[in-house]
UniProtKB/Swiss-Prot annotation:
This is Ribonuclease 3. Mg(2+) binds at residues 40, 113, 116. Homodimer. HAMAP family: RNase_III. It comes from Aliarcobacter butzleri (strain RM4018). InterPro entries: dsRBD_dom, RNase_III, RNase_III_dom, RNase_III_sf. Its EC number is 3.1.26.3. Residues 4-127 form the RNase III domain. GO terms for cellular component: cytoplasm. The gene is rnc. Its main location: cytoplasm. It is found in: Cytoplasm.
Length: 224
């Protein structure tokens, strides 16, 4: 059995049932009788609850719509990948040889799913009161400053102002596709400015994916 002590130290949690951590780290490509999809489903629900409560208490003057948008900026593939990297989760996941060749250990979708599964596993074994401080600690370590200015920015509007000034044109968003089960569908959007592709992003709705893509484009334009 592999040594998970470093991962458990990063989590500040020791699994009593090691089979649970193995299941949480096993991607479906690994072709075992088990994989992390069920734990991922559970983790997604629990993360939404914990982050939702955290934001409710942190931003007492924000309305429901604002809180939903702030949570959506954290509880998504990009956000979970960031948290997964915080605990170096890619070093521990079980993936197929083909996924290894395709750099699966750094793939956002695989890392995000594994992070949700690990959180689901901790919840299953030890409950909400144990899991909550773990999630909030990782969240606050990964995001230096969680505030409304950072999390509730309208990147699409900001980008359009930049492109109109620089290129006399507006960005074009193309829906590249959608994937995932109905309860957890993700949309992928590419962004084009003046005929040039500035990247892709995904989100739980087309609007959120467009916001994420706009942020990527803003960051790239700053470097040009």
């Amino acid at each position: 059995m592999s040594d998970y002590s470093k991962l458990e130290k990063c989590l500040d949690y020791q699994f009593k049932n090691k089979n649970l951590i193995i299941e949480a780290l096993t991607h479906k490509s690994f072709k075992k009788p088990y994989n992390n999809e069920r734990l991922e489903f559970l983790g997604d629900a629990v993360l939404n609850l914990i982050v939702g409560e955290y934001l409710y208490l942190k931003f007492p003057k924000s309305n429901e719509g604002e809180l939903s948008k702030i949570r959506a900026s954290l509880v998504n593939e990009t956000g979970f990948t960031r948290l997964a990297n915080e605990i170096k989760l890619g070093e521990y996941i079980f993936i197929s040889t083909a996924e290894e060749r395709n750099k699966g250990r750094t793939k956002a979708s695989i890392l995000s799913d594994a992070f949700e599964a690990i959180m689901g596993a901790i919840y299953l074994e030890s409950g909400l009161n144990t899991l909550k401080p773990i999630i909030l600690r990782i969240l606050e370590e990964s995001y230096d400053k969680i505030n409304l200015d950072v999390l509730f920015s309208d990147y699409k509007t900001a980008l359009q102002e930049i492109t109109q000034a620089r290129f006399a044109s507006i960005p074009e968003y193309k829906i590249e596709g959608s994937y995932g089960p109905d309860h957890k569908k993700e949309f992928e959007v590419s962004i084009w400015i003046d005929g040039k592709n500035y990247g892709k992003a995904s989100g739980k709705s087309k609007k959120l994916a467009q916001q994420a893509a706009a942020k990527i484009a803003i960051d790239k334009l700053k470097e040009e």
